[in-house]
UniProtKB/Swiss-Prot annotation:
Gene (UniProt): rickA
Ranges for domain WH2: 383-400
Region of interest called Disordered, as start-end residue ranges on this chain: 312-494
Keyword Translocase: no
Functional note: Recruits and activates the Arp2/3 complex, which in turn leads to actin polymerization, promoting Rickettsia motility during infection.
Organism per entry: Rickettsia rickettsii
Region (Central and acidic domains): 421-454
Annotated protein name in UniProt: Arp2/3 complex-activating protein rickA
Keywords assigned: Actin-binding
Low complexity compositional bias, start-end: 440-456
Amino acid sequence: MVKEIDINKLLAQENNALNAILSHVNELCKQNKQLQGLIEIQNETKELEKEHNRSLPWFKRFVKTVSNVKYILIKSEEQLTNEAIKYNNKILKDIDNKIYNIAEKSAPLKQALQEEIEKSFKDLTKKDLSKDQRARLSEVFFSYKSKPERFSALHMTNPLQFINAEALEKQFNSLNATKQNIQNLISENSNIKELKEIQKQVAEIRAEVPHTFFEKLNNIWQNVKNVFVNNSEQVLAKNKESNTRTIRKIDEQLYKTQHKFEELIENKERNIKDIIAKLPDNEELQKIVSNLTNHMASKKEPILANVSLAKPLENNIPPPPPPPPPLPDNNIPPPPPPPPPLPDNNIPPPPPPPPMAPVKTLSKAVEATTVKKLENQPRPSIDTSDLMREIAGPKKLKKVEFDPNTGKPVAHSHSKPAQNVNKPSGLESIFARRVAIEMSDSSSSESDSGNWSDVSVNRNKSKMLKTKGERDAKMTTHAQKINNRNSQKPSFVR
C-alpha cells in the first residue's frame, strides 16, 4: 500500500511528462490512421488524457495502450513505406525512453513497468503473427532495455551488486538476439517434431539474470544441434544452407558471450578480494574468503567445460591424430606384444608340444632299416596270373528265393562232398597264399636283423633264425587253417 502511494505521488509530479507522451502516441495514430485498429487506440488515448487522477492502474492502462500501438504497426508494416517505418520506429523509441525516465525514479514503478510490458508481450505473441513479425515485435517491444540501470533493481546481495551494469546490459541484449535467432531457426524447421518440444523451453526463458540466461540458453542450444544431427534427413533441402549459416552465427554469439562472462566474473572476483583485503582480519572474514574461492572455482569449471559446446559445429570434430615420428635407420624394432592375459576362469594354457628331436631320430632309424631291408632281402615275386584268371572267369549268379509267409530270403545249404571240404577253391587258395606271404613279410620288417623270423612268439624269448623249409611248412599250415574256416561258412555267403 505504501509503495502504491509513492507511485501515485510520482505520477502526479510527472503529469506534464505523461501528457507529452500521450500527445506523441496520438500523433503516431494520426500519421498511420489508414491502419486498422489505430482509430480505436486514438480514442483510448483521449480518454486517458481526460483523467486527471494519475494512479498505478492508470499507468498500467497507459503502458498497455502503447503496447497495442506497437503490435498494430508491426503487423501492418507491409502497408507502409520504408520512410514511414523509420519514422514510426523513431517515435516509438522516444516514447519508450520517456516512459523509462519516469519509471527509473521509483523502484516499485520500474518493477511494475517491467511486469506490465512482459505481460502485454506475452498476450500479443499469442495472436496471428508470422515468425518475422514476432521477431520484429520483440525488438520494438523491449527497446526500453537500452538503459543499463534496469539491473540495479535486481534483488542481489551487496557483494554481487553491479553498480555500473553496462556490460551486463550488452550481454543481456546479445542473449535476447540469440534467443530470437534460435526461435526463428526452430520455426523454419517446424516439420521436425523434436524441435516443437524445445521451442516451448526457449519461450519459457524470461526475466533471467544474464548469466543464468546464458546457461539455460546454451543448454537448450546444444539440444537443438543434437536434433539437427540426428534428424538430418528430415531437414528440407531449401533450408540446409540457411540452417548452416544460422547455426554458425548462433555458435559464434554464444562463444563470445561466454568469454565475456568469464572476464566479468574474474574482474568481480578481484574487486571482492580487494574489498576484503582492506577489512580487518578475523575468522568470519576468512570463512567468507574460503567460501568465495570455492564458489568461484565451482562456477568456472562448467563454463570452461562448455566452451567447446558453444563453438561452431565445424570445430566440434576432433582433429586427426598426428603421424608417429619416423624411426631412425639403426633403430631396433619394438619387441612383440606380450601374451594375452588369462581368461576370467583362470584356465591354464595348454602345455607346449613335445620336442621334435626323438621323432626325427625314429624316422631316421626307420629309413635306415627300410633301406637295409631292400638291399639285403628283396621282396619275393608273387604270381598273380591265377588271381586274374579267376577274376576274369565266368561268374554264376545264384537264384535267391523268398518265403511267401515272411517275405524274407530262404537260405539253401549246398554242401559239397566230404572229399572237397579240405580242398581250397581257386580264389581262396590264392588269397591264402598272398596273406601268408604278406604276414611273413611284415614279421621280417619288425626284426632287428632284417631276416625273416616268427613274430608270433613272445618278444622276451630269444629270437632264432628259421630255415626255408620251416617257413614253408608254417605257411602251408596257416593256409589250411584259413581254408577250414572258409569251408565252415554257409554256401550262400561269398
